[in-house]
């Protein structure tokens, strides 16, 4: 069974939770929070630093434990805090694997030398190359798309075709958006920057800021609730928040637009949940078994269905409630570029003054 340990304390208080360079992070080690040495030496146990909600990953790890007998200890915190913590702990980290909801954070961890390159045929057969690092030091597990959710009583679907449309004045006081600290917002803005350039992206962000006003939320589920209740007409969220809401409230007046699908459009913005083995791990073979379990068809199906995400294994079908993956295009900005795009994106977000 997956054991839920005390959540990690954040190791940074930066507004946008920037990744701290390794030398600076080294000063942040808190020895009292490290796992006991007996835990570190347990051959039948893995420690996973997870940026994913516990309820969405614990059942998968429980299934892995039932199959292999290997226990998984799950320590949860924000993705940026986890990467900074790995830097601070260095070779003394108890973590065997890092699991995050953002490819950019995984690529930053890879670039900082925190993850171990892998040679695994199971991974290369199961997960297409665009969803993993070139050296397999991180591997995508499931996909999510940044979409427009709208209230069907307030909006007609042909009123919106692009995310950029949401910056138009007609959506003044009708729009809800994530706050500026959202990893999803930061990754989405990075893709828009890479596609359209800084000038157009800045105008887009200024429009979002003005149109949303006070309708800025910490949780994407709050955005979906606001749209469902008619407090606003439209919002920007990852797709699965809408389908999760509809699973419990099927009559809610909600629908999804996969944006930017017109000819010449950038395509829907995609990110992945992914995992990598930490370089200092002493349980590499067991960690590989976990990754092998997660990329196999059964693991992919379970992992994706828990949160209405898109499996990355080409032979595993998504929940039929979701928009058919073959019916829309994804943006062409490589996931591995999200790391290099991040800092300039945060600077632009700050300049615009998003809340």
Where do the model's predicted regions map?
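Extracytoplasmic ligand-binding site segments that recognize negatively charged/polar headgroups
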Residues: 51-58, 77-81, 94-232, 264-266
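Bacterial N-terminal signal peptides
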Residues: 14, 22-36
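A bilobed periplasmic-binding-protein/Venus flytrap-type ligand-binding module shared by bacterial periplasmic
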Residues: 147-154, 270-283, 302-305
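Periplasmic-binding protein-like
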Residues: 173-180, 293-316
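Short, polar/charged alpha-helical segment
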Residues: 51-72, 245
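Immediate post-signal peptide segment of exported/extracytoplasmic ligand-binding proteins
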Residues: 40-47, 65-68, 168-170
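A ligand-binding cleft/hinge motif common to bilobed small-molecule-binding domains
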Residues: 104-108, 228, 233-254
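An extracytoplasmic/periplasmic, membrane-proximal ligand-sensing/linker region
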Residues: 199-201, 309-355
């Amino acid at each position: 069974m997956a054991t839920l340990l005390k959540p990690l304390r954040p190791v940074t208080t930066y507004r946008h939770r920037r990744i701290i360079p390794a030398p600076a992070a080294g000063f942040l080690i808190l020895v009292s929070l490290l796992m006991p040495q007996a835990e570190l030496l347990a051959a039948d146990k893995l420690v996973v630093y997870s940026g994913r909600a516990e309820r969405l990953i614990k059942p998968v790890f429980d299934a892995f434990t039932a199959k292999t007998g290997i226990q998984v200890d799950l320590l949860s915190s924000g993705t940026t805090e986890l990467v900074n913590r790995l830097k601070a702990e260095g070779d003394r980290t108890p973590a065997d694997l890092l699991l995050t909801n953002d490819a950019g954070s995984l690529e930053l961890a890879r670039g900082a030398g925190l993850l171990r390159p892998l040679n695994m045929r199971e991974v290369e057969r199961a997960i297409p190359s665009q969803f993993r690092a070139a050296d397999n030091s991180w591997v995508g597990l499931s996909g999510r798309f940044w979409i427009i959710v709208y209230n069907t009583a307030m909006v007609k679907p042909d009123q919106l075709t692009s995310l950029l449309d949401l910056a138009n004045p007609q959506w003044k006081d009708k729009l809800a958006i994530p706050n500026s600290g959202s990893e999803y917002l930061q990754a989405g803005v990075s893709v828009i920057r890479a596609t359209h350039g800084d000038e157009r992206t800045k105008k887009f962000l200024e429009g979002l800021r003005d149109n949303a006003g006070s309708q800025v939320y910490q949780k994407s589920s709050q955005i979906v609730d606001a749209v469902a209740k008619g407090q606003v007409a439209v919002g920007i969220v990852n797709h699965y928040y809408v389908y999760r809401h509809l699973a419990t409230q099927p009559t809610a007046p909600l629908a999804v637009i996969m944006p930017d699908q017109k000819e010449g459009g950038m395509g829907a913005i995609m990110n992945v949940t992914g995992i990598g083995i930490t370089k200092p791990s002493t349980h590499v073979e067991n960690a590989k078994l976990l990754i092998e379990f997660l990329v196999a068809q059964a693991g992919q199906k379970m992992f994706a269905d828990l949160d209405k995400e898109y499996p990355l294994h080409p032979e595993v079908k998504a929940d039929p409630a979701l928009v058919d993956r073959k019916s829309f295009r994804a943006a062409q900005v490589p996931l591995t570029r999200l790391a290099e795009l991040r800092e300039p994106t945060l600077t632009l977000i700050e300049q615009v003054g998003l809340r």
